[in-house]
Amino acid sequence: MLEIRAVQPADNKELAATLRGILIEMGVPKVGTAYADQALDCMFETYDVPLSKYFVVVEDGQILGGAGIAPLANFEGPVCELQKMYISSSLRGKGVGRQLMQKCLDFAREAKFEQVYIETMPYMKAAQQLYVKSGFSYIDGPMGDTGHSACPVHMLKDLNNDA
């Protein structure tokens, strides 16, 4: 059975291994991307702060992906970042990404953010399709300073225009 829930302290090791495995599978550079983030090894602690939350996708007791929301680093204003949204290949194309996105957007609204920002890789076409279907638009350049200089695709969603 599939479950999407908030990250727990006991998830850290398995979640880090899962996310790094997905990043390697996708051919993501190890420098200038989420792969190098120290936060990957302590996701519970990273998101156990105000205005932040990370959700994990669990199937049959195994962590198969996740996504989170946190304030956009080095940016003033009510803007959050959709972070580290990765799903195991075994679950792609089954609507799990849409469910995970909805959990994140619901949290962003509850936290009173007005916009959601994301950075991604140009070859992650399926992810970009999900982002567009979820109301994200392409923007010309980065916002804030996420440290992900190798991610050249930038997108933004206005939460105030949602139905």
Regions found by a protein language model. Name each.
Residues 62, 75-76, 84-102, 110-111, ...:
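Conserved glycine-rich acetyl-CoA-binding loop
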Residues 32, 41-44, 51-52, 83, ...:
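Generic intrinsically disordered, low-complexity segments enriched for polar/acidic and small residues
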Residues 21, 114-117, 121-134, 138-163:
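C-terminal "cap" of GNAT-fold acetyltransferases
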Residues 13, 94, 153:
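Glycine-centered loop/turn positions within well-structured domains
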Residues 2, 6-83, 88-89, 101-103, ...:
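Acetyl-CoA-dependent GNAT
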